[in-house]
Structure formats: structure tokens, C-alpha cells
Amino acid sequence: MATEYALRMGDGKRVYLTKEKIVSEIEAGTADAADLGEIPALSANEMDKLAEILMMPGKTVSVEQGMEIPVTHDIGTIRLDGDQGNSGVGIPSSRLVGCMTHERAFGADTMELGHIDYSFKPVKPVVSNECQAMEVCQQNMVIPLFYGAMPNMGLYYTPDGPFENPGDLMKAFKIQEAWESMEHAAEHLTRDTVWVMQKLFASGADGVNFDTTGAAGDGDMYGTLHAIEALRKEFPDMYIEAGMAGECVLGMHGNLQYDGVTLAGLWPHQQAPLVAKAGANVFGPVCNTNTSKTSAWNLARAVTFMKAAVEASPIPCHVDMGMGVGGIPMLETPPIDAVTRASKAMVEIAGVDGIOIGVGDPLGMPIAHIMASGMTGMRAAGDLVARMEFSKNMRIGEAKEYVAKKLGVDKMDLVDEHVMRELREELDIGIITSVPGAAKGIAAKMNIEKLLDIKINSCNLFRKQIA
């Protein structure tokens, strides 16, 4: 009897497949992506590599040593303190505790602060609270801390917003009115996002993470791109990450353009240059998971799309890999066997510069991804490499070389806890364990500024406050 291997379906259910079936599923998945995106399918060697990863006997797998990448985040601390019946585990804790738990306990390379409603529009009435939380977090933390939220243009339509729902207008054959409603909503999205981030950046935020860009279609992406453009013009040093909602931009409007390019129907490799043109530092491409297909099919398809996006992108790519995207099953508690295999494949085959950790419980998302492919933050040098990707738009290889040279170590040492533990204490750039007298928070980040020859926003704020 042929040997069968334990894989997953797109909904997380376990399924057993032979090697021949796995190879067949990989071929079908990459062919689907190649056909839709008009991009190259995976080569025979790449498909063999993917099959090898999927058939590895261990419950968890990880990237080869030296191939680790930094991670960014969606949903912030909501995966810890959230309790809405989704992936939040309902631990009563402050957002400061949540952020520092990711930094000190999970080994995160970066982190983000976010509102419980996690959209920019609801932040407006409570922006002062968000600014206070950001200031307190920045005073205590060392790794880059973003403010994260969804553009979520749907909130600008009735009954939640001021503009008539374009779906209702289209059903009434009021096409022109539907277009105008989307255009007005996009303008308000841009305005609100810029206003919120002006406040947060003035409170020390390292930058902004636009999560699920394009969720409401091409108007949503249009408004977000213009927000990125405005923020980059006003704040040249702001870290900006733009993560997508789906693999293909839905043409709800159909005629909206950015930089002369029609947004409707763009695939990840076509989205990347526009996001870079707008002024983002990091692009978060997406490939949606099909819950009725196997993990072999889904992962092959996702890796194919992401490989093309990485090659086309002028800026680093942090592939979105929460539940339901990036080859990850659509399950609130993502199976760690599937998560770690997807994580490894994205790094070793697609060549991503990082991973944006999305929705999922703490063990199934940040812990699994960081164990599989992360640089482990302050335990090593992950936060330093992440800062170079965002402050100078460096791809992963260049960022590692730069940081290694500044530290006077080999690139392999950047993820060596033994080397970095002593070196971080010697340089006083923040250490993960509590040592009395060692630089923490702002003090550690000021030393990082000198080491890497960069400016950090929270340090600039502190200098203004004591001037």
C-alpha cells in the first residue's frame, strides 16, 4: 500500500494523501495561479521542494539556518485581549502588556498597536486615547511599533457612514450615483487616515500598517494609495506597510486609476509597483485560501503568486499569512503543522523578505511563524534588520548585510542568541531579559540610532520634550 502523508484541507481538516496525489495537487495549484495572473508556474525543482516540505515527518518544520526573516503583524494585541468569538483568546490585559508580551515573550521582530474595532474611522473619536497608549508603549519598548488599522471603506456607507451604499444604488441601476458614492467615500478614507496618523506619529509611532487594503474594492485601494502618498510627503521617515485584503483587486467601481493604472483586476505582482510608487516601505501581498482545496493546492498557488510579487516589487515584501491567506487554513486556531510548512515554503521558495502575521490564536500565529522562520526580535537581531527594511527599503539580504557589518559579526550571528545576548548588553541596545541598569525603551533606541545610523521617531519626540 502506498505511503500516505498527513496534510490539511483549506478549512483545516486533516486529510491523507499519497506522494503522487500531493504532486498532482501542487501542479494544479501553481497552474491555476499562473493562468489567472499570467505569471510563470513553479519550476520542477521548486515543485519538488514544496512537496518535500509538505511531506516532512515532523509536526513542525522551519527554515534552514541563516534564512530567517523579520515578521510584522496584523490585529496587534487583539489576539490576546480580544474575545469576540474569533481568534482572540480573551486574556484580560492592557495593550501595553500585550505589546510587550509579543516583544519579550514571543520574540517578535516588530509589533503594532491597534484599536479594538481595528479600523481608522472608529479611531477618530478616541484618537487621544490611542496617542496616550502609543506614547506609553514607545517609552517601554525597543522593537519597531506601528499603529495598525484597516482602511475599511465599507464603514463610510449607510447605515454606518454618510454615503449611500453603492450596492443598493447598483441594484437600482443608478450606476453614476454608485460611482460618485465610492469616490466620495475614498476621499473621506484618505482624509481620516492621514488625520489619525498625523496624531499617532506626533505621539511617537514608528509608522503605520494598512491592513486589508482593498477590502471594499478598487475604491478602498484608491483611497489608501492616496493616503500613503500624502503621509510619505508629510513624513519622509515614517515606516509604512501596506497589506492587501485579497489576491485580486475587486472592480466595484471599475474606472479608478492610480499613476495611470486601472486598479480593478490587479494581481499581487501588479499591485506591488503601485504600492511602492505611492511611498510604502513594505508591501504585503495576499493569496486567498480555498477552503475546499488541499493545503498542497493552496500553498502551491500562494507561493506562485508571491514569488512573482517578490520579483516585481521594488520594495520588501512581507507576505500576509494569517488564517485564510498565504496557504494557511481558514481556522481560528490554525494547525501549526500547516502554518510552519507554509512559512518555510514562502521563505525558501517564494523568497519573501518577511511575513505579516495575521489573524489566529497566539500559538497558531505569532509563535508558530516565529519558531518556523522569524528572527526572534530582541533575542537576537530581528528588530535591527526590520528597522533597515523599513527605514531604507532594504531587501532582506541587504538589510542583514548592513546590520551584520554595523555589529561586526557574521550574518549567521544575527539569529544566534548566544552571540547577540552578550553583544546587545555590551552595546546597550536593549536586551530581552531584565537587567538592572541596562538601557531600556527610549534609551536603548537612542543607542540603536547611533549604531545603525538612522533616526527613530519616538527618540525624536523625546528629544523635543527635553529641549
UniProtKB/Swiss-Prot annotation:
Pathway: One-carbon metabolism; methanogenesis from dimethylamine
Enzyme Commission number(s) of this protein: 2.1.1.249
Keyword set, alphabetical order: Methanogenesis, Methyltransferase, Pyrrolysine, Transferase
Reactions that this protein is recorded to catalyse: Co(I)-[dimethylamine-specific corrinoid protein] + dimethylamine + H(+) = methyl-Co(III)-[dimethylamine-specific corrinoid protein] + methylamine
Catalytic class of the enzyme: transferase
One Pfam family in the UniProt entry: Dimeth_Pyl
Conditions for induction: Induced by growth on trimethylamine but not methanol or monomethylamine. Part of the mtbC-mttB-mttC-mttP-mtbB1 operon.
One GO term (biological process): methane biosynthetic process from dimethylamine
Source organism superkingdom: Archaea
Molecular function in Gene Ontology: dimethylamine methyltransferase activity
Keyword Transferase: yes
Keyword Ribosomal protein (UniProt): no
The protein's assembly and partners: May form homotetramers or homopentamers.
Function: Catalyzes the transfer of a methyl group from dimethylamine to the corrinoid cofactor of MtbC. The major or perhaps only DMA methyltransferase expressed under inducing conditions.
Family assignment from sequence similarity: Belongs to the dimethylamine methyltransferase family.
Name recorded for this polypeptide: Dimethylamine methyltransferase MtbB1
